[in-house]
Amino acid sequence: MKYRIIWLFLVLFPLQIVCQSIVNTESMSAKSDSTFVFTTSFDGNYTSGNIELIQFNSANQLAYKYDRNLVRLFINYEYISQDKETLSSDYTSQLRYSYSLKNNSVYSFIQGQKAVSLSLNSRYLVGIGYRQNLYKKDKNYLDVAFGPFYENEMYLKNSESSVHVINYRYSLSSFFNFKITDKLENNTVFYYQLKSNDFQDYRIYFEPKIAYSFEHFKIYTTLRYRFHSTPYVEIKNTDSQLLFGFTYDLGFN
């Protein structure tokens, strides 16, 4: 039995307040034949003086693989405070199961979420899908995935402006990895989520990442872009992030 631990340390430079309506599980998915995988990331910032800013972020994955079965648990948390006012205290957790069909797979997931930055008290998802490989050679690949999911959201709970939304959505996503040189590669993901009975209501997530590999770690930069065509409360429909960081891989048998 093989065990593997992967530690990620990130430096975060936010362009806007982060919207966590769509979660990219691909970026935390370690490509490994290990039986167990644990991946974690931490980053933070403290500023004092004219402005007092506290920021802390953590993303974690625990994965178990047996034969063609893969079970993954994702837990993410973000906290931002400015002048002792909480701007963000957001969490996302997702339990995901995948069954491999050679280069393809079927999957199911359940997800829970809270996002103060979006006035989102709770968001619960249940979904299934199919992932198809279109191209694969060495580390280069192109996959697409499609599946429906159930969405239950509560905004501004316990207020006169509370909004409770139940949707059924279709999710279409693509996953692309291209090896530029022996040590430099590009990984890009794209998610498109469409409301089943209102095609004017859709969400988009786009994240390209450039990574450079050294002997025992990688450095990278990535841009995260999110868009919701019809927000259900008075918030911005677009947000983005620019991140720089490195990963360190520690493994043992």
Annotated model-derived regions:
Residues R68-L73, N103-Y107, D138-L142, I180-N186, ...:
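Repeated loop/turn-to-beta-strand initiation elements of outer-membrane beta-barrel proteins
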